[in-house]
Amino acid sequence: MSRVDWFRGVGPMSGNTRSHAMNASRRKFNVNLQKVRVDFGSGKRTLRISTKTLKTWRKKGLI
């Protein structure tokens, strides 16, 4: 299962991790995905959405 937000399509990003000596080594920043059951008109579905999307939907009253 891919680590992609169902709504925004945002996936993992790449960057560097830095040691105390400022040596850089590549790493991957994964999206914080959560499984949420959402009620559509045709029925309920389980979606994998990011916590940023979840926060926005809760603020707008969609969940």
From Swiss-Prot:
Coiled-coil ranges (or none): none
Keyword RNA-binding found: no
GO biological process: translation
Keyword Ribonucleoprotein appears in the UniProt entry: yes
Keywords: Ribonucleoprotein, Ribosomal protein
One Gene Ontology cellular component annotation held by this UniProt entry: ribonucleoprotein complex
Molecular function terms, GO-annotated: structural constituent of ribosome
Listed InterPro entries: Bacterial_rp_bL28, Ribosomal_bL28, Ribosomal_bL28/bL31-like_sf, Ribosomal_bL28_bact-type, Ribosomal_bL28_sf
NCBIfam families, A to Z: L28
Family of this protein: Belongs to the bacterial ribosomal protein bL28 family.
Protein name, per record: Large ribosomal subunit protein bL28
Organism of this sequence: Mycoplasmopsis synoviae (strain 53) (Mycoplasma synoviae)
Lineage start: Bacteria, Bacillati, Mycoplasmatota, Mycoplasmoidales, Metamycoplasmataceae
Gene: rpmB
